[in-house]
Amino acid sequence: MDDLEQAILLASDSPAAAAASPAVRAEALAYCARARDETPPSSLLHLCLYGLASSPHAHVHFWCLQTIHDALLLRRRLALPDDLALLRSSLLSLAVSSNAASPPFLRNKLAQLLALLVRFEYPHVYPSYFLDLIPPSPPLPGPTDMFARVLVSLDDDLLSQDYPRNAEEASDAGRVKDAMRAQCVPQIARHWHEAAVSLRAADPAVAAVALDAARRCISWIDVSLVANDVFVPLLFDIALSPGSVAPLAAAAVGCLSAVAAKRMDARAKVALLRSLMSAQKGFGSPDSGLKMAHLVTAYAVEALECYRKLGSSDADGAAALEMLEEVLPAVFAAAESGDDDEVDSGSVLEFLSGYVSTMKAPTEKQLGHLGQILEVVRMQMSYDPVYRGHLDVLDKIGKEEEDLMAEQRKDLIALFRSICRVAPGATQLFIRGLLVTALSSAEVSVEDVEVALTLFYRLGEIVGEEEIRTGAGLIRELVPMLLSARFSCHTHRLVALVYLDTISRYIKFMQENDQYVPHLLTVFLDERGIHHQNAHVSCHAGYLLMRAIRLLKAKLVPYLDTILQSLQDALVQFTATDWANKDIKFSSSEDGSQIFEAVGLLIGIEEVSPDKQVQCLTALLNPLCQQIESLVMDAKAQGLEESSPRAIGLQQIIVALTMISKGFNERLVMGSRPTLGVMFKKTLDVVLQVLISFPNVKPLRSKIISFLHRMVEILGISVLPCIPIALRQLLVDNEAKDMSEFLYLINQIICKFKSSANALLEDVFPAIASHLSVILSHDAFSNGFASNTEEMRELQELEKRFYAFLLHIATHDLSTVLLTPSCRHYLENIMQLLLITSCSHKEISHRKTCVQTFVNLIKDWCSSSEIEDKLPGFRVFMIEKFATGCCLQSVLDKSFNFRDGISIALFGEIMMAQKVMYERFGENFVVNFVTKLREAHCPPDLAEQYYQKLQGNDIKAFKSFYESLVMKIRQQQNGSLVFR
């Protein structure tokens, strides 16, 4: 044992181990492991018991107890009865003689081992465990502490229902509880009371452990053993006494809470709650809430549940509601205390939500309670002032706090909404009080203003648009109050952002009440909005102004000059800022460019006179175009790097031009106000010079593509002559992402201009096909990258847009382009790609697109007479390859899922393809397809029925029949046909 003892000390965190080398410690660990694993069970037990009796070292005692515990847990079936009896008597002797001064980790391990023996042996092998362990009266600290730890370990490892248990554990737990209830629970309860009385002053820590053990057992013992005239007053006295140390007071509160939460019939629960209420004068007072937060919350939850079950018409139900309302002041005090250690805010919030949900038409008393609940919501939604600076600059700490608060507020907002629905008037009065307080004090905090505005914003989510528009309730008073508000802390980012959002939430009120439009514009244009010192606030204000202009439109025409004058410096700053050196990161939807969209929308309002539009647009476009020309000239002389200030400056200007154009449409620009069209056409020419000069600067090219999208939309057919030169430049040095953007533009042009784009498409198609044959080669997918890489995602997106490109060609009278001499060279590869994809691509949506493309090509290229076909051989290809591979074999494959929505849509397109092939190809298609059906083991009668259904006009019946035919063939083949 001496060698083992030395090894244990070296392997532990003892002083001897600290002085040992790593090699020596490793050797000691290995020695201990061999002793534990290779010693026979009986010998190991005797060795450990000897160590417990003879060694003076706590680390050795712990190793021995842990080793016995593990061996017993793993080999208990092999343990001899005599060994177990020896172990039992030794451990009970240690427990009974336990000294409270011994290390807690050692007492916990001894308790855990005794709890395991209880599980295995009580009561059938040894029925006296608890009778032996219950300390005699008067209880001493050592044995009392040890007994409590045994009960706690037993609860943790077996009895508690807070943890998942397997069937064997559940059976053992039931057996132990039943035996304890029959044998010793009353004696144990008396011991808890005696320990609390005698040790609360002498050794409060041990008294607290004893009461914690009691709390754990209350859920399954006879509650009257604790809920009586002797024990309950004692617990209240301990909980509320100024002389009670915090752990002891908390343990007493825990016991009372467990009593309140005890499961029982609702009427019995009402009687129990009544007894608790009567046992302590002032139980529902705010002071009780501060000192017994867990208890008053549990009490309120149980009273509410009784009220729900019994109803207000029942005497006990009414009594439950009365007791609930009596304890509410204590609940509110607990909730408002902000003490996270004492108050479970989740439980309080759940109770308050349940309480509000019981209200239909609140009484005056209940309205008062709702006001207090709103105050709880306000307090719990408020930020901690310690994070004020972090939230203003939004550093890492501030971002984490903002995210945490957003999550924390979800349930609070749900509760706020419930109150709004039950008592809208009271809610509006509450918010009015918050706003008045915030506006009347120069010392009001950032946190108080932010939460007041947030609640007003959330109110706007709940009330209907009609109520906002008409200013129902107090909205007619609150919105003007808000419009004129200038809070002392308005410079703070949080306050400024929520202020602007709240103004925007109620903008329908300004739409109906024109007199407030100037106030609204002032908010957006002064230092509260676009001219705020914080760049994030300024950009957000620009975005919200753009939305306001979209809504108010003609109402803003009288203020056009005022708005443009106020925005002049912001417009200049956007294109002049050195964004390359800015650390600020903006979301793509709020990067500051929205002020250009706002101005474009404003100028583009039809109520603005033509001359005024020309004047304003000239003042906007000319300086931007001049900036572009100057930057291009400098860049040609000195070069243009992708991340250089010049390149980024050009990007910003082109973004600004794109955003301005969003305020205009083709009808206005090319119809009623053609002068505007000329101006945008000149701007396009300037932008194209950038593309011609620097086609390889990818970020710049991406911004130019976005601008081209807008020009296609507003200039209409007149833009076509400018497009070829742009497209040729956009095909320079392309990768997957670049080609994807390019195809998106081409697809827009095809959909917009249809057959008018014939010549353009004929010109660029060979280059497109050539580029894509390389980028979308088989090697790119099979040998390139893992399927989850960014490169692979870009390839997949390009593939999707290419199939859409072919479909747009086929559906917009442009399929003859594919038959021209310059494009025909690529036709065979395209047909094979469409065939393979339609039959077997893993993306069902791609297969559907390809089938639709084939259907449209059949309609375009084939007639009922083969002589008139535009592409010789296409008919045979469709009958022999497509019809067989896609319409039959691909759906016979067991991977084709008839329960999947996208697959069902594909199946519908396949059925349509068969109808079109029959319409254009006639008997040639039918004969070949029926032959293939028979080769696939289709019964002859079903093949004949197929022909009949194909000839009919009911496509739904045809589809249903063909699905059943496919399933029957699958069954006959037993899934043997797998098409790839």
UniProtKB/Swiss-Prot annotation:
The keyword DNA-binding does not apply. GO terms for molecular function: nuclear export signal receptor activity; small GTPase binding; tRNA binding. Expressed in roots, stems, leaves, flowers and embryos. InterPro entries: ARM-like, ARM-type_fold, Exportin-1/Importin-b-like, Exportin-T_C, XPOT. Keywords: Cytoplasm, Nucleus, Receptor, RNA-binding, Transport, tRNA processing, tRNA-binding. It comes from the Eukaryota. One of its GO terms (biological process) is tRNA re-export from nucleus. Belongs to the exportin family. This is Exportin-T.
